[in-house]
């Protein structure tokens, strides 16, 4: 169901990945995303997949937890692959009426789908190992230099974190409403796509009402705790870079150099 979406959820732990500075993890994820688009060979993608597997092992995440983040989006991933199969020009491998599958389309379709999977996995790995509060502190710290040009660093960080954390909350609420409707005889699994979409309409109004209610409750809770933004705000634990963060930075740099070499080789 919709609760299978894991992006935005935090998995408590005390692994070396959990203990990394949030700024290190955020920068590492951004760096990894760049490398995903840099990869262009099976070996490159194998290295990136190995990095995710190693990260999940070091974070001591349960087997299959990361893979759950792919399940809700498998239709989008599959659709991306199929579209490339039949729309990209190249050497024809199979033809039926107006549909032509090309070799280049298959290669590009697999690449694009794999990129989507890797981007989703690395994002989920970060949110699994970083609590919302720590993630907010990390984003705020990275945005702090932009305060000189008027960028509200803390407010932006808080908005981004609340939005990210609200994803699983909203999905849980949707699942709860769907189960309540199903107990009253609603059917969301049968019929064609149009009928299923029409059957989802009764969910929208209670979902909107519930979302506004939760947002109002959050605002009241923040006011009750005298929340006044980032000005003068202190932290229980200050962010400090350690040896593990430096080692992570070196690993990411080495990985980038390796992928750049695999893509372009040694310049003459």
Curated annotation (Swiss-Prot):
Which cellular component terms (GO) are annotated to the entry? Answer: plasma membrane
What membrane topology does the UniProt entry give? Multi-pass membrane protein
The principal location of this protein is: membrane
Described by its record, this protein's role is as follows: Transmembrane (T) component of an energy-coupling factor (ECF) ABC-transporter complex. Unlike classic ABC transporters this ECF transporter provides the energy necessary to transport a number of different substrates.
Q: Which Pfam families match?
A: CbiQ
Query: Listed GO molecular functions?
Result: transmembrane transporter activity
Subunit text:
Forms a stable energy-coupling factor (ECF) transporter complex composed of 2 membrane-embedded substrate-binding proteins (S component), 2 ATP-binding proteins (A component) and 2 transmembrane proteins (T component). May be able to interact with more than 1 S component at a time.
Span-the-membrane segments of this chain are: 26-46, 47-67, 73-93, 116-136, 151-171, 246-266
Where does it live in the cell? Cell membrane
Q: Which InterPro entries match?
A: ABC/ECF_trnsptr_transmembrane, ECF_transporter_component, EcfT
Q: Which HAMAP family match?
A: EcfT
Q: Which keywords does this chain's UniProt record carry?
A: Cell membrane, Membrane, Transmembrane, Transmembrane helix, Transport
Signal peptide extent: none
The name under which this protein is listed is Energy-coupling factor transporter transmembrane protein EcfT
Q: Which family does it belong to?
A: Belongs to the energy-coupling factor EcfT family.
Q: Which PANTHER family match?
A: SLL0384 PROTEIN
């Amino acid at each position: 169901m919709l609760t299978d979406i894991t992006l935005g959820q935090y998995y408590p732990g005390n692994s070396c990945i959990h203990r990394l500075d949030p700024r290190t993890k955020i920068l590492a994820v951004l760096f990894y995303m760049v490398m995903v688009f840099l990869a262009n060979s099976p070996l490159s993608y194998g290295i990136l997949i190995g990095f995710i597997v190693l990260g999940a092992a070091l974070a001591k995440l349960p087997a299959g937890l990361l893979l759950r983040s792919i399940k809700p989006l498998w239709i989008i991933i599959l659709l991306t692959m199929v579209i490339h199969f039949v729309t990209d020009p190249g050497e024809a491998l199979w033809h039926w009426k107006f549909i032509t599958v090309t070799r280049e389309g298959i290669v590009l379709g697999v690449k694009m789908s794999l990129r989507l999977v890797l981007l989703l996995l690395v994002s989920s790995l970060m949110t699994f190992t970083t609590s919302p509060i720590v993630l907010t502190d990390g984003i705020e710290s990275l945005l702090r230099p932009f305060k000189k040009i008027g960028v509200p660093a803390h407010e932006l960080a808080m908005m981004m974190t609340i939005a990210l954390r609200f994803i699983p909350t909203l999905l849980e609420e949707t699942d709860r409403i769907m189960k309540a409707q199903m107990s009253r005889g609603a059917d969301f699994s049968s019929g064609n796509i149009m009928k299923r979409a029409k059957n989802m309409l009764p969910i929208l109004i209670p979902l909107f009402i519930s979302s506004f209610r939760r947002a109002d409750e959050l605002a009241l809770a923040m006011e009750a705790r005298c929340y006044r933004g980032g000005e003068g705000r202190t932290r229980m634990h200050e962010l400090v870079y350690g040896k593990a963060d430096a080692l992570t930075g070196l690993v990411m740099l080495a990985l980038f150099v390796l992928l750049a070499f695999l893509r372009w080789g040694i310049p003459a």
